[in-house]
Amino acid sequence: MVKSTIEESVATGRRKQAVSSVRLRPGTGKIDVNGKAFDEYFPLEIQRATILSPLKVLGHTEEFDLIIRINGGGIQGQVIATRLGLARALLKKNGDSKQELKSRGFLTRDPRKKERKKYGHKKARKSFQFSKR
């Protein structure tokens, strides 16, 4: 197998059912998400700002190219999973930035998941309508 000469760091982020793999390599700021342009996959500005916030905090907005692969979940779960993956990739690249990223909550994995449905209930906690007679 041929070793690549490009220095790249790869990290994974998860949120609910969304799993995001982020490849960070030196470049000009080009971002590719599942083969689409960044603003095509994430049309809302707030989503793009949330994902790029770890880069903005460290001041590396135009220094890296990102290749992002996302599976599962909804849009918001994918956004948070990608942000976590990006923060972890930046941490691999530069270990000095851990305190800055951790204090802003970028390295924290949100453990909440969908609660399972219980038998005898309509949903996880919602019951069927009660009838006294």
From Swiss-Prot:
Keywords: Ribonucleoprotein, Ribosomal protein. It holds the Pfam family Ribosomal_S9. Residues 114-133 have a biased composition (Basic residues). It comes from the Bacteria. GO terms for cellular component: cytosolic small ribosomal subunit. The keyword Repeat does not apply. The keyword Ribosomal protein applies. SUPFAM superfamilies: Ribosomal protein S5 domain 2-like. Signal peptide: none annotated. GO terms for molecular function: RNA binding; structural constituent of ribosome. Belongs to the universal ribosomal protein uS9 family. HAMAP family: Ribosomal_uS9_B. This is Small ribosomal subunit protein uS9.
